Every structure is written in structure tokens, then in C-alpha cells.
């Protein structure tokens, strides 16, 4: 019964476990890939070159547990029993958690490509390509879907809204413009998942700023200098950002004003 599944997570190369939401007991475990003879040693676990390495985390939607690998595979497992439903290759490493909505699965790879797949068959429906700078952070933004529109961030420092049906761009908004003379100084990845709350969309860039913008056209409502590559959270009319110094910052959703900051976790790698 898929409704009893509380968590689905990867415990190694190709090994996935589902846990009962009421008892915490294991419901099922499956091995969709084998780790090239490495077993589960620490050295093997850290070897991202292994094709079975799950690089994109686990996403849940459309009755599926969705995983992305360093090989560029999107793997769909049944949430109910762990059966592999399909597997599709998008070309390069999946850098974030795949997302599913309304019969489609969306996955972003580290080459700046967003791919839409049929949730029942894994067949490719469309792709959208963004320009990737020479030097970027490892990982990518996970797509988020609302009202048949896909929103995602890219290493270019931009957030893009696309029609979920065909990948047609609706709008594009720059969160941060690259600045500085060196490639390191010019890294402005939007690696955190765009956050939708209170009828607005929020995004944050590394070495850049946080922006609250209109869902309809991407027009900025406010901007606040900060730097982060971690996912945001929201609640009580605020968004919460963990910046690159591990300071937790609460920002008012409407005004963009900082409500409070908590520096007690500095340099603790939140």
C-alpha cells in the first residue's frame, strides 16, 4: 500500500529502501543496479564515477520513487513495492532530485538540460537547454511544478518558467549577474529549488542574492544580497535561507526585509 510509505531513500549504489509511515519498519527494499564489484566500502561509496551512484536523490510523485544517477539515468520505481517501472537516459549526470507532476517527470542534468519524460513509459517528451558557464558548483536546482508550469534555476544565475506540456519558455529572470575577474568570482549558480509560497516564487543564487518574484511574469518584488546553494524553507510569512556561512536568515516574504538571523550554527555545514 503506497499510502503507508513515509520515506524512500537510497542506502548505497542502486539500493533503495521504503519505510512504513506508522511503524518505521521497512516495507520493501530493492536493488536497481549493482556497484561494479565495489561492495559498500567507504572508498567505493564515495566513487561518483560508478554508474550506479545515485547523484540526484529520491523524488516522489505519480506513484513513483524517482532517482537520478551519475550515468544520466532516471530510474522510476513503484512506491508501492519497489518494482522498476522504467529507466531512461538523459545523457549526462542528474544533479538534483527528479520531480513528477500530471503525467510527466522532470529532471535536470549537470549540462544545463531540463528533460521531461512520460511518467508511465519514461519516453522523452521534450528538452530545454540552458547555457552553462565554464565553472559551476556541483549539483543543480530541482524543478518545481505549479499550475502546469515548470520553474527551475540554472548555473547561469537565472530562473526560468516553462510550459510543462511542451517546454516552451514563458519567462526568464536573472537572480544574479556574474561579477569579478576570475571564474571563481563569477559563479552564480541557482542550485536551490525555487520556492513557491504566498502566490510568489523565491530563488537564491550563490555569491548573489535572494529574490522574491511574480509567478506570472518573473518580475522581481524585492531583492536581498546573500549567498546560498541550499534549499529554502517557508512558514509564518517568512522564507528561511541557510547562507554559505551557515547563518540561518529569516526574510519577510512580502517586503524582503530580514526578520532575524541565527549565527549559532556558523561553519557547521548545515
Language model features with spans:
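Short loop/turn segments that connect beta-strands within beta-propeller blades
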Residues: 20-23, 78-81, 118-122, 163-167, ...
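Structural signature of WD-repeat beta-propellers
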Residues: 11-12, 69-70, 109-110, 154-155, ...
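Beta-strand-rich domains and repeat architectures in extracellular enzymes and scaffolds
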Residues: 1-12
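Extracytoplasmic beta-rich repeat domains
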Residues: 1, 29-59, 84-101, 124-147, ...
Amino acid at each position: 500500500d503506497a499510502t503507508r510509505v513515509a520515506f524512500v531513500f537510497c542506502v548505497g549504489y542502486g539500493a533503495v529502501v521504503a519505510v512504513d509511515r506508522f511503524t518505521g519498519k521497512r516495507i520493501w527494499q530493492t536493488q536497481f543496479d549493482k556497484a561494479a564489484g565495489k561492495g559498500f566500502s567507504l572508498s567505493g561509496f564515495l566513487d561518483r564515477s560508478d554508474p550506479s551512484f545515485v547523484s540526484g536523490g529520491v523524488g516522489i510523485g505519480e506513484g513513483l520513487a524517482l532517482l537520478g544517477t551519475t550515468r544520466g539515468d532516471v530510474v522510476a520505481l513503484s512506491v508501492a513495492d519497489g518494482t522498476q517501472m522504467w529507466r531512461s537516459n538523459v545523457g549526462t549526470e542528474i544533479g538534483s532530485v527528479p520531480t513528477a507532476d500530471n503525467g510527466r517527470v522532470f529532471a535536470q542534468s549537470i549540462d544545463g538540460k531540463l528533460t521531461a519524460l512520460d511518467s508511465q513509459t519514461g519516453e522523452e517528451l521534450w528538452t530545454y537547454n540552458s547555457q552553462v558557464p565554464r565553472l559551476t558548483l556541483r549539483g543543480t536546482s530541482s524543478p518545481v511544478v505549479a499550475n502546469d508550469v515548470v520553474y527551475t534555476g540554472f548555473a547561469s544565475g537565472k530562473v526560468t518558467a516553462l510550459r510543462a506540456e511542451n517546454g516552451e519558455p514563458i519567462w526568464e529572470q536573472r537572480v544574479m549577474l556574474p561579477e569579478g575577474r576570475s571564474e571563481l568570482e563569477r559563479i552564480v549558480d541557482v542550485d536551490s529549488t525555487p520556492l513557491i509560497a504566498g502566490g510568489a516564487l523565491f530563488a537564491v543564487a550563490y555569491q548573489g542574492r535572494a529574490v522574491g518574484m511574480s509567478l506570472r511574469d518573473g518580475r522581481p518584488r524585492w531583492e536581498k544580497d546573500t549567498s546560498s546553494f541550499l534549499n529554502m524553507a517557508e512558514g509564518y510569512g517568512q522564507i528561511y535561507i541557510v547562507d554559505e556561512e551557515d547563518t540561518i536568515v529569516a526574510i519577510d516574504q512580502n517586503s524582503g526585509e530580514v526578520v532575524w538571523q541565527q549565527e549559532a550554527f556558523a561553519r557547521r555545514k548545515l
